[in-house]
A protein has these predicted regions:
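Short hydrophobic/aromatic-rich motifs at helix boundaries and adjacent loops
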Residues: 1, 91, 415-416
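Extracellular glycan-recognition regions
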Residues: 14-207
Length: 488
């Protein structure tokens, strides 16, 4: 039995010899038709597919599928047949709204060259984006839809599946399609992959205990909004800073500051001596030689200290607390921070050497997150003085305070890019109070001179995602932390 959808060149069939799946066919236009062979003895599927790509706003590939609803996962061993072909050919575990070439979808894609990515199109006709994993050429992959979030796990040879890090938010209407796909990345040829040890599981909603937290350190390219996983852990990590030379990242975890070198998967502790209760407000001096930390070891009140980036006994800067570091002036002479004095949180500055602090804001409600513009003319901050949390800026002496964002989101932690062109910030939904952890949030970006606000990423995060400056030195990328709650 066969039929055609409205999309020209897209045909699908249902066949009783497809094992646990219901149908298969070419999605989009493929000059060479694909096929599926099911080995009922081995319970494996050999899928041949053509198609130009699964990317941009539409896809072309061969798809073996079944309809499902609810929270579900699909896992399989994946093996390419043949060593040649296009390095960008894709063998995929696919979750898809429908069989239209421009459908919303997510897939765990193993490329011919070994690159493995969690790819997605949030809605029909949108551009495709991806989260690249640091795990190359896995032998087994799993894609999981839990609520409105999709994530991926991977396994190398002789290893167990492990989280690949990162997840994204996508809304699919039930029922939707789940299955296996192959794209040759060249419409003139076909490629073949074997999928075996297939598991399709319903994810139970029962909670047997407290969920476990998974933290992922990621970067996002500003131009493409594609994401790359650098590090994933079951520890709680927060607030990345990018080094001035671009060679490493900092983050805090369990009261300590860690340094992760480029291409390394083993963070190293920076020796902060007695400061062992560091929070997520820390960052580097303009020359990259000094580190500012906010530590709560003394009387559980956050105080600001400075130490060499190599580590050493910290030097106290603020004698009053709580004080939370957020910005370093481009000339290296002044620190900006949020502090509570007499029951009110406002923005303050203080010389790097310490001394008398200067109060820059003094209005009812919280003012937080001060960060300097790269030319040293302005301090950007977030304030709830108008009833919701919005982005503001002022001159460095506190004068000329003006509102930058005016929308239905609660916007936090504005960070100007090093080239002075962009402001990135964290946005919560309008009914969220404060900046809690483990919420649906967005990373958003806008031109410094005003203009359209665009979404960089929708993720599960909040507190700890981008509390402090995290731009790459060339302004092309942003570092952040995303989170995932895993039921035991």
């Amino acid at each position: 039995m066969a039929w055609s959808l409205m999309n020209i060149g897209t045909a699908f069939s249902q066949n009783a010899s497809l094992g646990i799946f219901e149908g298969n066919g070419d999605v989009g236009t493929s000059l060479k038709p694909g096929s599926v062979h099911y080995d009922s003895t081995q319970k494996s599927y050999t899928i041949t597919g053509g198609g130009e790509n699964m990317w941009f706003t539409k896809d072309a590939f061969h798809f073996l599928w079944k309809k499902v609803s609810g929270n579900v996962s699909l896992a399989a061993d994946i093996q390419w047949i043949g060593t040649g072909g296009n390095p960008h050919r894709k063998a995929c575990l696919v979750i898809r709204q429908n069989l239209d070439p421009s459908s919303a979808y997510a897939d765990a894609a193993v490329h011919g060259e070994g690159l493995t990515s969690l790819q997605y199109r949030s809605s029909a006709g949108d551009l495709t984006h991806e989260i690249q994993s640091y795990i190359k050429a896995p032998v087994r992959a799993r894609i999981e839809k839990n609520g409105n979030y999709v994530s991926m796990s991977l396994a190398r040879e002789n290893e167990e599946l492990q989280p690949a890090g990162g997840s994204f938010r996508i809304q699919l209407t039930e029922p939707f399609y789940i299955g296996l796909g192959v794209c040759s990345h060249d419409s003139n040829v076909v490629e073949t992959a074997v999928f075996s040890h297939i598991e399709i599981k319903t994810i139970e909603s029962k909670k047997l205990g407290e969920p476990m937290l998974e933290s992922t350190l990621e970067t996002i390219a500003i131009a493409s909004t594609d994401r790359k996983v650098l590090y994933t852990t079951r520890d709680h990590i927060e607030a990345p800073n990018w080094s001035r030379d671009g060679k490493y990242l900092l983050f805090n975890s369990n009261g300590l500051i860690y340094r992760l070198e480029a291409n390394s998967k083993t963070p190293q502790v920076i020796d902060t001596r007695l400061a062992i209760h560091c929070n997520n407000d820390h960052g580097l001096s303009p020359d990259g030689k000094l580190l500012a930390i906010s530590d709560q070891s003394k009387d559980n009140k956050s105080l600001i200290y400075i130490l060499p980036i190599e580590g050493r006994e910290p030097r106290l800067v603020t004698s009053l607390g709580p004080s939370y570091w957020h910005g370093w002036s481009p000339d290296g002479k002044t620190l900006a921070y949020c502090a509570e004095r007499k029951g009110q949180y406002d923005i303050y500055t203080i010389p790097v050497e310490g001394g008398e602090e200067k109060q820059l804001t003094n209005v009812p409600g919280l003012d937080d997150g001060p960060d300097y513009s790269p030319d040293g003319q302005y301090i950007y901050f977030n304030s709830e003085r108008t009833g919701s949390m919005q982005i503001w800026r002022m001159k460095t002496d506190g004068s000329g305070q003006e509102q930058i964002t005016k929308d239905d989101c609660n916007n936090w932690f504005a960070h100007p890019s090093p080239d002075g062109k962009w402001i990135v910030f964290l946005s919560y939904e309008k009914d969220v109070k404060g900046h809690p952890a483990n919420k649906d949030v967005m990373l958003r970006i806008m031109p410094v001179g005003g203009g359209e606000i665009k979404v960089l990423a929708k993720l599960f995060g909040g507190q700890g995602t981008i509390n402090v400056p995290s731009w790459s030195p060339d302004s092309n990328n942003l570092a952040f932390v995303s989170y995932r709650l895993i039921n035991p």
